[in-house]
Amino acid sequence: MLNSHSITIAIDAMGGDYGPSVVVPGAVKAAQITGAKIILVGNTPEIEDQLALLQVKNTKIEIVHASDVANMDEKPSDILRRKKNSSIQIACRLVKEGLANGIVSAGHSGASVACGMFIIGRITGVERPALASILPTEKNPLILLDVGATVDCKPYHLFQFGLMGHTFACDLLNIQSPRVGILSIGEEEGKGNTQVKEAYELLKMAKDINFTGNVEGRDLFTGNVDVTICDGFVGNVALKLSEGLSSSLSRVLRKELFSSGIFSKIGTFLAKNAFKNFSKLIDYAEYGGAPLLGLKGIFIVSHGSSNEKAICNATKMAVLFEQKETNKRLIDSIGLNEELTRFGHSC
């Protein structure tokens, strides 16, 4: 494993709902924990103000000025063409030029995907990138991909998502032989639309992955698979549905418990550790972000409402990616299955 002190991560300091006031403290904490060098990209005076408030000393923090910001109401294509001096574009160029190993951004997710693809570039052989989200289950965490990078997929795109998800699970979740499934409308082979059925056949023939077949939506959170693949449209709907459901259930549970009688309140007090553990389980900040797999550099896309903890954990994930040399293993896996990808093209 590579020494984290030799790793550099560029962070979009202007990204997210809160900008430098949250991103800078999270980045500083990550630098202190990992020992990695951090490049904060954004408005220099604003970043310096935050560093002064934190009284940062003896930490490997550098600032690269960006005079522009990618706004959430702008089209990704417009940001890519017109905002060359935006923090997201400059951070991506640092990775492309070899000045940083990876990037973390809580900014415009569409711009993140566009800039990642067209500035950093895709790994040779990778057709489309995929955003991989980590979700809680009854057992172990689940990797769901794609959750929004590629909404219109060919079967061979899904096939490559399976390869990339397998490698991610091996390296980041330390699973020796992750179980890979494809999201469909039934467990049995032959269920699903044409896209899913053709991808299923490719995945059955894949080298070095443990493909277990179809996964129904109701089984996503049972923990019976480690990686579930789907196109970015379905994946994003599934992700937002799970986030909304968990938030609603938490609010309903809290309301019922605290509006009931004295015995319910006593029970709530006795079970406070269980509720604390549950809250931690469904907190997206625990992992910090979703890696955009398939690029030549590391790119962690964080939630727009990320707090300091989320930024810190996203940065730690980027460092771990480089330490584990995950991209090299992705390249090996894509190369090993190159013939199947070509076969998928011909179908």
UniProtKB/Swiss-Prot annotation:
Protein name, UniProt field: Phosphate acyltransferase
Disulphide-bridged cysteine pairs: none
Molecular functions per Gene Ontology: phosphate:acyl-[acyl carrier protein] acyltransferase activity
GO biological process: fatty acid biosynthetic process; phospholipid biosynthetic process
Catalytic activity: a fatty acyl-[ACP] + phosphate = an acyl phosphate + holo-[ACP]
Gene: plsX
Domain of life: Bacteria
Family named by the database record: Belongs to the PlsX family.
Main EC class the enzyme belongs to: transferase
Location(s), subcellular: Cytoplasm
EC number: 2.3.1.274
Subunit structure: Homodimer. Probably interacts with PlsY.
